[in-house]
C-alpha cells in the first residue's frame, strides 16, 4: 500500500506491509505458546513435542521482530532524497540521505528474486559503485514504482 504526503518543496512516499501479515504471525506465535503451556501443564507430553513447540514459538517470534514494517522515500527539492527502512524494533531501522549533486541517475529496472521477476527502483550515486535500491525489502508493484518515479523526477528536475 502506497501513501503519499506532499509538503512545500518535498514529497514523501511510504510503502506499508500487509496488516494481516503481522496478525498471522502473532496468531502462530500465540498458538504455539498455548500448546507448549498446555503440554507442560499436563506433564506427560513427550519431550520432542515440547521442543518442537518451543522452536516454532522462537522462530515465529524472530520472524515478527526481524520484519520490516514500512519503507519510505523522502524527496526534497534542492537537497536530495532520503530512504528509510522502518522495522518493528527501532534498532533494526535504517536511513540514508543522498545529496542531489551526487545523484547520477534514477531508474526502474527488473531483476530476479528467487524464481520470480520483480521490479525495483534504483539510484545510481556518483561516488559509489553499487546501486542504492529504493524499497529493497518490500519491492512494490511496477505501477507503484512508476508513480513514485514520475513524481520524484519531476520534483528533482524543478531545481530553482
UniProtKB/Swiss-Prot annotation:
Its EC number(s):
2.4.1.198
Q: What class of enzyme is it?
A: transferase
For this UniProt entry, what is the primary localization, expressed as one broad class?
endoplasmic reticulum
**Pathway membership, UniProt:** Glycolipid biosynthesis; glycosylphosphatidylinositol-anchor biosynthesis
Q: Which GO terms describe its molecular function?
A: phosphatidylinositol N-acetylglucosaminyltransferase activity
UniProt KW keywords: Endoplasmic reticulum, Glycosyltransferase, GPI-anchor biosynthesis, Membrane, Transferase, Transmembrane, Transmembrane helix
Sorted alphabetically, the Gene Ontology BP terms of this entry are: GPI anchor biosynthetic process
Query: What membrane topology does this protein have?
Result: Multi-pass membrane protein
Which GO cellular component terms are attached? endoplasmic reticulum; glycosylphosphatidylinositol-N-acetylglucosaminyltransferase (GPI-GnT) complex
Membrane spanning stretches: 22-42, 48-68
Keyword Transferase among record annotations: yes
Reaction(s) catalyzed by this protein? a 1,2-diacyl-sn-glycero-3-phospho-(1D-myo-inositol) + UDP-N-acetyl-alpha-D-glucosamine = a 6-(N-acetyl-alpha-D-glucosaminyl)-1-(1,2-diacyl-sn-glycero-3-phospho)-1D-myo-inositol + UDP + H(+)
- Would I find Electron transport among this entry's keywords? no
UniProt-annotated location(s): Endoplasmic reticulum membrane
Functionally, this protein is described as follows: Part of the complex catalyzing the transfer of N-acetylglucosamine from UDP-N-acetylglucosamine to phosphatidylinositol, the first step of GPI biosynthesis.
Spell out the PANTHER family in the cross-references: PHOSPHATIDYLINOSITOL N-ACETYLGLUCOSAMINYLTRANSFERASE SUBUNIT H
What this protein is called in its record is Phosphatidylinositol N-acetylglucosaminyltransferase subunit gpi15
- What is the species of this protein? Schizosaccharomyces pombe (strain 972 / ATCC 24843)
Amino acid at each position: 500500500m502506497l501513501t503519499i504526503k506532499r509538503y512545500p518543496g518535498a514529497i514523501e512516499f511510504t510503502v506499508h506491509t500487509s496488516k494481516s501479515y503481522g496478525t498471522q504471525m502473532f496468531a502462530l506465535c500465540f498458538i504455539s505458546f498455548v500448546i507448549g503451556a498446555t503440554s507442560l501443564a499436563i506433564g506427560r507430553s513427550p519431550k520432542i513435542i515440547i521442543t518442537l513447540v518451543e522452536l516454532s514459538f522462537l522462530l515465529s517470534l524472530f520472524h515478527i521482530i526481524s520484519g520490516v514494517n514500512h519503507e519510505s522515500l523522502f524527496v526534497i527539492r534542492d537537497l536530495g532524497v532520503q530512504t528509510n527502512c522502518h522495522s518493528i524494533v527501532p534498532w533494526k531501522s535504517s536511513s540514508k540521505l543522498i545529496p542531489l549533486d551526487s545523484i547520477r541517475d534514477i531508474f526502474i529496472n527488473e531483476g530476479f528474486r528467487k524464481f520470480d521477476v520483480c521490479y525495483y527502483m534504483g539510484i545510481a550515486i556518483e561516488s559509489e559503485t553499487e546501486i542504492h535500491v529504493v524499497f529493497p525489502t518490500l519491492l512494490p508493484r511496477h505501477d507503484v514504482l512508476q508513480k513514485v518515479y514520475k513524481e520524484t523526477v519531476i520534483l528533482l528536475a524543478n531545481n530553482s
